């Protein structure tokens, strides 16, 4: 695959996916590493290892299945580690990573997770995806409050190109935003130093208490808040892939790289939706090219390690938010359409959508999981009670 020979919108979809992933949560990983007492150099090494791991896994799975399979670090898992690693050492942290990733591999080997994912109705998966992405759409238009000129210009460029050259609409918005930001002096490039920092091996230290209090919650949060939405997102986008091999591969890769700071590698949901949308490629069978491009950008991000985080800080937050919202707009509308198509499933889908969009967190598990649970309960109750009335 030659990156330069791919359609520009396809390549840019991969770039936007990686950009959104790093911009939205890289800082949380830095905080988690700091909680374990990591130095700036060690943190940069973590970022390098994570970028390379995501690049390898994304490219391998995408090329193997010829489907847009994007991997990511677990953002909810990183948030959990910010508090869970307080007062612990780096060897303690690595021991926690190994236990959590081993549990993910075990979940894939047994096939339990795959069986659970097969029973989720398509309408609920689509509703959950729409609920996950809703905040990105709201954030995008919320940026007009503080950055009307830049974000308004991005929106106008997107609208114009959506009419005359739809595949280049997101690119036009990106260029417009950067142009305005540079003109306004809001891009601080002076503090960025591009250099590669390689990760160092940290021998693990295992503790039953730490495994129970941190590793098991990390495993549960990663599966419920990241892998479940990620698999459901693929399902909602029309890609039916075997789930257990995905869990085994990502879990094993993270397990092997745990001593270098890779606390988790899981199936992406939000960023994957960018590569699975019609904007990435009009032909669904060719959208894997966008994910492959994202894999290459992951490797580049990993090569430069901590410098990527500095770049994210240099770009205006509102630019990233507007770009993400516009890139996900077609996916949001498509997911809502799929969720509400069947009248008999509509109420349950709305429940799943609203619970997911609410941001509800219970027992450290995010709203995407609870959206599926609430929607599933609604689906079971409502479809059962409506069958007699329909037949009568």
Q: Model-derived features: where do they sit?
A:
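Membrane-interface helix-boundary motifs at transmembrane edges
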Residues: 162-165, 238-239, 281-285, 343
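Alpha-helical membrane-protein architecture signal
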Residues: 8-11, 153, 212-213, 248-252, ...
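Membrane-embedded alpha-helical modules
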Residues: 86-192, 293-392
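Predominant activation on well-ordered alpha-helical scaffold segments within soluble catalytic domains
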Residues: 29-33, 57, 78-82, 138, ...
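Helix-loop-helix hairpins and the membrane-proximal interhelical loops
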Residues: 1-44, 171-243, 391-392
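Helix-loop-helix junctions within the multi-pass membrane cores of secondary transporters/permeases
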Residues: 2-4, 10-29, 48-129, 241-329
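Residue-level signal for transmembrane alpha-helical positions in Major Facilitator Superfamily
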Residues: 23-24, 149, 225, 267, ...
């Amino acid at each position: 695959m030659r990156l330069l020979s791919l359609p520009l919108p396809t390549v840019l979809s991969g770039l936007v996916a990686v950009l959104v992933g790093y911009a939205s949560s890289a800082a949380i990983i830095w905080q988690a590493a700091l909680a374990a007492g990591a130095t700036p150099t060690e943190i940069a090494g973590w970022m390098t290892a994570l970028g390379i791991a995501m690049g390898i896994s994304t490219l391998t799975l995408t090329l193997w299945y010829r489907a847009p399979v994007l991997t990511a670090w677990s953002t909810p898992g990183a948030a959990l580690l910010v508090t869970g690693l307080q007062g612990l050492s780096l060897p303690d942290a690595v021991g926690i990573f190994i236990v959590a990733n081993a549990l993910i591999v075990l979940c894939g080997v047994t096939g339990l997770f795959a069986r659970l994912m097969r029973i989720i109705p398509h309408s609920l998966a689509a509703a959950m995806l729409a609920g996950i992405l809703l905040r990105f759409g709201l954030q995008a238009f919320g940026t007009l409050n503080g950055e009307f000129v830049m974000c308004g210009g991005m929106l106008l460029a997107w609208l114009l190109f959506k009419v005359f050259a739809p595949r280049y609409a997101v690119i036009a918005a990106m260029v417009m935003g950067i142009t305005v930001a540079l003109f306004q002096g809001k891009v601080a490039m002076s503090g960025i130093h591009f250099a590669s920092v390689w990760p160092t091996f940290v021998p693990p230290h295992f503790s039953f208490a730490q495994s129970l209090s941190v590793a098991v919650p990390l495993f549960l949060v990663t599966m419920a808040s990241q892998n479940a939405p990620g698999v459901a997102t693929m399902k909602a986008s029309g890609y039916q892939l075997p789930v257990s091999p995905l869990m085994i591969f990502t879990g094993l890769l993270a397990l092997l790289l745990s001593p270098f700071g890779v606390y988790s590698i899981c199936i992406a949901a939000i960023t994957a939706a960018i590569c699975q949308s019609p904007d990435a490629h009009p032909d669904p069978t060719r959208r894997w090219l966008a994910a492959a491009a994202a894999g290459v950008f992951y490797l580049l991000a990993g090569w430069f390690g901590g410098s990527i985080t500095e770049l994210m800080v240099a770009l205006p937050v509102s630019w990233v938010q507007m770009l993400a919202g516009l890139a996900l707009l077609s996916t949001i509308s498509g997911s809502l359409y799929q969720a509400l198509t069947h009248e008999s499933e509509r109420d349950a889908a709305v429940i799943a959508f609203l619970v997911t969009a609410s941001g509800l967190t219970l027992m450290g598990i995010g709203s995407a999981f609870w959206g599926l649970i609430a929607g599933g309960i609604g689906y079971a109750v409502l479809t059962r009670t409506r069958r007699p009335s329909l037949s009568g």
